[in-house]
Amino acid sequence: MSQYSGKICFYEGRCFTGRCLEVYGDCDNFQDRGFMNRVNSIRVESGAWICYDHPDFKGQQYILERGEYPEFQRWNSHNDHMGSCRPIRMHGEQYRMELFEGCNYTGQCMELCDDCPFLQSRGFNTNCVNSVRVFGDGAWVMYEEPNFRGRMYIVERGNYCGHNEWQAQNPHIQSIRRIVNYF
């Protein structure tokens, strides 16, 4: 299996009941595969996935790692809408990123190589992260609230010169973790 693939199963009903949609790679629209956008449980058999509540990889993002999610609250959703998904692009296990207070890599900078439950406890003086550089091999999840809570955003290897590039509506980020459970 490539590091970009895996298997995820979406179920219409809670506790893995009802119709099932099995996905092995990018799926930009569940309805194109004959599956309505209502998902009440998910089983991630392999890989780590980013799921969106709208088709075409748009809307609220949910990060799902190997395991079982018997109801939508388990993946921090407030409803059963799900429209698209893709495997997270993992290249290996070397994690490194730089966070910047300002757009275009300006202002206060902080380097991370491991999980951080509260950025301000490590000396980042603001809760605004406006640009990010992800080096190394791994992917990261950034959260709007401390302790890996709230709205989440995925960043993979590359440069993000503004918060809109990771589909955030605002630059508020207070905790960050690595995605390590992807096989």
Curated annotation (Swiss-Prot):
InterPro entries with a match to the protein in the record: Beta/Gamma-Crystallin, Beta/gamma_crystallin, G_crystallin-like
**SMART domains documented for this protein:** XTALbg (SM00247)
Gene Ontology process terms (BP): lens development in camera-type eye; visual perception
Pfam families for the chain: Crystall
Provide this UniProt record's keywords sorted from A to Z.
Answer: Eye lens protein, Repeat
GO molecular-function terms, A-Z = structural constituent of eye lens
Which residue range or ranges hold the Beta/gamma crystallin 'Greek key' domain? 6-46, 47-89, 95-136, 138-180
**Hey, which family's this protein in?**
Belongs to the beta/gamma-crystallin family.
Complexes and interactors: Monomer.
Role according to the record = Crystallins are the dominant structural components of the vertebrate eye lens.
Domain comment text?
Has a two-domain beta-structure, folded into four very similar Greek key motifs.
What name does this protein carry? Gamma-crystallin N-B
Taxonomic source organism: Danio rerio (Zebrafish)
